[in-house]
Swiss-Prot record:
This is L-ascorbate peroxidase 1, cytosolic. Binds 1 heme b (iron(II)-protoporphyrin IX) group. The keyword Cytoplasm applies. The lineage of its organism: Eukaryota, Viridiplantae, Streptophyta, Embryophyta, Tracheophyta. It comes from Oryza sativa subsp. japonica (Rice). Heme b binds at residue 163. Pfam families: peroxidase.
Length: 250
């Protein structure tokens, strides 16, 4: 979709760059890239194409949205970011949370996802139940990412590769463990591990395995496992799209 980005002031652009530097330092020091990426994704992934509600507009800071079951643990991310936000009040929460996701990928060795500022904070959080359910298969993934958010099959598989970062926590999701050997390194190992089958100590969710059994998803898994550069290019595009759902639509 064509975008018509708002023009922001020089002062605002400076605030964005200052926030970027502070985020780099925080994420490197606290090893919290996976948490920040999850915050950005869960903020944006509530967008609904048909009603034009939800999306990356800063509502994650509200107790109502933080209380959604899919967001268990994200209150930690919101608390960690608040001192930086207080220091840089010019930047919107909407931009700040999406910038945190972009910086998380970059600090972990992933691609440089483009960032366009100008999202405005919205007051009302989206209803619960719009984020993907890890226990379900490819039809569910297409319903949430495709029909609801307006993303493609390629976007679904590329974004799944973001699970190269982080781990599941039983008290948050009911699942336990990392997807890859180095959960702080952004690379294509999610796909190589997925293709090599179950291994002790590593996690494969039903929604991960769905990528192997689906005839449209599997070739993309194989492509990204064989070619990290191709994965980075497609991931960058998918992350950008996700971070701008409902923002600056021309």
């Amino acid at each position: 979709m064509a975008k018509n980005y708002p023009v922001v002031s020089a002062e605002y652009q400076e605030a964005v760059e200052k926030a970027r530097q502070k985020l780099r330092a925080l994420i490197a020091e606290k090893s919290c890239a996976p948490l920040m990426l999850r915050l950005a994704w869960h903020s944006a992934g509530t967008f609904d194409v048909s009603s034009k509600t939800g999306g990356p507009f800063g509502t994650m800071k509200t107790p109502a949205e933080l209380s959604h079951a899919a967001n268990a643990g994200l209150d930690i991310a919101v608390r960690m970011l608040e001192p930086i936000k207080e220091e840089i009040p010019t930047i919107s929460y909407a931009d700040f949370y999406q910038l945190a996701g972009v910086v998380a990928v970059e600090v972990s060795g992933g691609p440089a996802v483009p960032f366009h500022p100008g999202r405005e904070d919205k007051p009302a959080p989206p209803p619960e139940g719009r984020l993907p359910d890890a226990t379900k298969g490819s039809d569910h993934l297409r319903q949430v990412f495709g029909a609801q958010m307006g993303l493609s099959d390629q976007d679904i598989v590329a974004l799944s590769g973001g699970h190269t970062l982080g781990r599941c926590h039983k008290e948050r999701s009911g699942f336990e463990g990392p997807w890859t050997r180095n959960p702080l390194q952004f690379d294509n190992s999610y796909f190589t591990e997925l293709l090599s089958g179950d291994k002790e100590g590593l996690l494969q969710l039903p929604s991960d395995k769905a990528l192997l059994s689906d005839p449209a998803f599997r070739p993309l898994v194989e492509k990204y496992a064989a070619d990290e550069k191709a994965f980075f290019e497609d991931y960058k595009e998918a992350h950008l799209k996700l971070s701008e759902l409902g923002f600056a639509d021309a």
